[in-house]
């Protein structure tokens, strides 16, 4: 009976499985913030990340139609759209809001937006195997996306946040420069990961995920660096 129910309403289970990794990562990163952000802004940033998927997917389909035979270009454009729209949504929700009052806040809100994005993305990926009653496939896809996609989105969005955090107390022009650098680095990171996944043999996928984990460790160190930044002009 349970199997019949989830096959009839696959979105429910897919969403539960899609949001669980996001909640784990959200708890992990929020506890790193010594000055917790308002729950309302966290929630809105998460929802904003989810909503950005609704714009990103149609644009990615258009790109695929025209450049699907140019692998590097198509993956770069896909990554660009994802990183830009994740940023744009959270920028208008939180980053330009007065609640963003310390360097580390940029990282936190961008990670929350990324988790909203990956929750919706994970949900869409899991619907089909659930609908087909492929429980094993659902578990495998869920775990792989927990290890790969979730970490990738966290790391790429946090890259933008780190650059913004490093420039938090700098001039407006320097902030724009750091932001531009952050977006470029995030796109390169995101596109490179996707290209590695496609071009590497299946047996090497875990080594790629290992590289992402190394990146997360580096992210943690940079997170602590940004937390230590103070406004010397005060």
Map each language-model feature to its residues.
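Hydrophobic alpha-helical segments at protein termini of multi-pass membrane proteins
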Residues: 1-234
């Amino acid at each position: 009976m349970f199997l019949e129910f989830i096959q009839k309403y696959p979105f429910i289970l897919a969403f539960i499985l899609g949001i669980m990794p996001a909640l784990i990562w959200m708890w992990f990163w929020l506890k790193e913030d010594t000055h917790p952000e308002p729950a309302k802004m966290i929630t809105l940033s998460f929802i904003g990340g989810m909503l950005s998927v609704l714009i990103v997917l149609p644009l990615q389909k258009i790109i695929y139609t025209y450049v699907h035979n140019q692998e590097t270009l198509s993956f770069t454009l896909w990554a660009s759209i994802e990183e830009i729209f994740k940023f744009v949504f959270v920028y208008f929700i939180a980053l330009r809001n007065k609640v963003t009052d310390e360097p580390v806040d940029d990282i936190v809100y961008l990670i929350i937006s990324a988790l909203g994005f990956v929750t919706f993305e994970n949900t869409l990926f899991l619907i089909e195997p659930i609908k087909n009653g492929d429980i094993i496939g659902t578990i495998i896809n869920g775990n792989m996306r927990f290890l790969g996609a979730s970490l990738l989105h966290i790391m790429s969005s946090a890259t933008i946040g780190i650059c913004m955090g490093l420039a938090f107390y700098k001039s407006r022009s320097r902030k724009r420069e750091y932001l531009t650098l952050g977006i470029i680095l995030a796109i390169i990171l995101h596109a490179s990961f996707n290209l590695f996944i496609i071009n590497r043999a299946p047996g090497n996928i875990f080594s790629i995920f290992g590289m992402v984990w190394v990146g997360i460790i580096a992210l943690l160190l940079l997170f602590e660096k940004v937390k230590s930044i103070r406004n010397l002009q005060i």
